Swiss-Prot record:
Keywords: Metal-binding, NADP, Oxidoreductase, Potassium
Cellular component terms per the entry's GO annotation: cytosol; GMP reductase complex
Catalysed reactions listed for this entry: IMP + NH4(+) + NADP(+) = GMP + NADPH + 2 H(+)
Binding residue positions for NADP(+): 108-131, 216-239
Function: Catalyzes the irreversible NADPH-dependent deamination of GMP to IMP. It functions in the conversion of nucleobase, nucleoside and nucleotide derivatives of G to A nucleotides, and in maintaining the intracellular balance of A and G nucleotides.
Name of the protein: GMP reductase
Enzyme class: oxidoreductase
Gene: guaC
UniProt source species: Shigella flexneri
Length: 347
């Protein structure tokens, strides 16, 4: 046993220090990034935000809606090959280039993903997703996927420390998914005692990944557009959003009605709700590590997308970054004990 004494920080623990700027307007900020990925060799340009691969977020409808904003969607792994075929038949090439195919690590997952990727060559992203990316089996699966799909861009996770980030990149991942326990409907930290404050995880993993020519996506912990800006400021190449994109018409959650008001169910992918839906229930040897919440319906996702992108542009103007690419270099974090004036928050 050992104790690390240095303080680890989440998004709520910091603010970004403003700096002198020559920008005249938020409209002067360029949010699009251009990337060439380490292993796949693929080039990609777009806004580096990803809708999470949760079945109440990462839907085909979400992918179609967010593609118009140049945003990616990691489509959840529970769609059938036939449903994928129908989606591809009704989608433009522009939509398909904004889609990630999500998969687990079983043999059945591998075969299903292979069938989906064979449907259309425009599907260039694979998201290999498990709750605990520290297992040897997971690393071996990433290597297997890289061998099978040498020209596909592979995103793999989740991990929160530099050494495991390096391990995954060396095994074939182009992008490492960073985050254990920060999600709005994740209870891993309270069920297991395991986790890592998200901002510190992003900073540590970005340093490790960039040293090897890899990239990271910050997955979880964002509750506001300001948190998205902090994730990019901390070195994230991409930011994945779940709760911020839940509750919309495109989100795919079940709608329930209480006292004449409609709500949409949103749950973690390790929750009892998710396991009942997809595997028949919680296995006797494990505990649910997610919760289910009811969200007031939020309308179409386009309004939320505009709000997120607008906040991100504004953050860039406050530090003098004319491009999102410059935000990390222009960011100085200050530790704080407060984020906002909350006097009217309950009204």
């Amino acid at each position: 046993m050992r104790i690390e004494e240095d303080l680890k920080l989440g998004f709520k623990d910091v603010l970004i220090r403003p700096k002198r700027s020559t920008l005249k307007s938020r409209s002067d900020v360029e949010l699009e990034r251009q990337f060439t990925f380490k292993h796949s060799g693929q080039s990609w340009s777009g806004v580096p935000i990803i809708a999470a691969n949760m079945d109440t977020v990462g839907t085909f409808s979400m992918a179609s809606a967010l593609a118009s904003f140049d945003i990616l969607t990691a489509v959840h792994k529970h769609f059938s090959v036939e449903e994928w075929q129908a989606f591809i038949n009704n989608s433009s090439a522009d939509v398909l280039k904004h889609v990630m195919v999500s998969t687990g690590t079983s043999d059945a997952d591998f075969e299903k993903t292979k069938q989906i990727l064979d449907l259309n060559p425009a599907l260039n992203f694979v998201c290999i997703d498990v709750a605990n990316g520290y297992s040897e089996h997971f690393v071996q699966f990433v290597a297997k996927a890289r061998e099978a799909w040498p020209t596909k861009t592979i995103c793999a996770g989740n991990v929160v420390t530099g050494e495991m980030c390096e391990e995954l990149i060396l095994s074939g991942a182009d992008i490492v998914k960073v985050g254990i326990g920060p999600g709005s409907v994740c209870t891993t930290r309270v069920k297991t005692g395991v986790g890592y404050p998200q901002l510190s995880a992003v900073i540590e993993c970005a340093d490790a990944a960039h040293g090897l020519g890899g990239m990271i996506v910050s997955d979880g912990g964002c509750t506001t557009p300001g948190d998205v800006a902090k994730a990019f400021g901390g070195g994230a190449d991409f930011v994945m959003l779940g709760g911020m994109l839940a509750g919309h018409e495109e989100s795919g959650g079940r709608i329930v009605e209480e006292n004449g008001e409609k709500f949409m169910l949103f749950y973690g992918m390790s929750s009892e709700s998710a396991m009942k839906r997809h595997v028949g229930g919680v296995a006797e040897y494990r505990a649910a590590e997610g919760k289910t919440v009811k969200l007031p319906l939020r309308g179409q996702v386009e309004n939320t997308a505009r709000d997120i992108l607008g906040g991100l542009r504004s953050a860039c103007t406050y530090v003098g970054a004319s491009r999102l690419k410059e935000l990390t270099k222009r960011t100085t974090f200050i530790r704080v004990l407060e984020q906002e004036n909350r006097i009217f928050n309950n009204l």
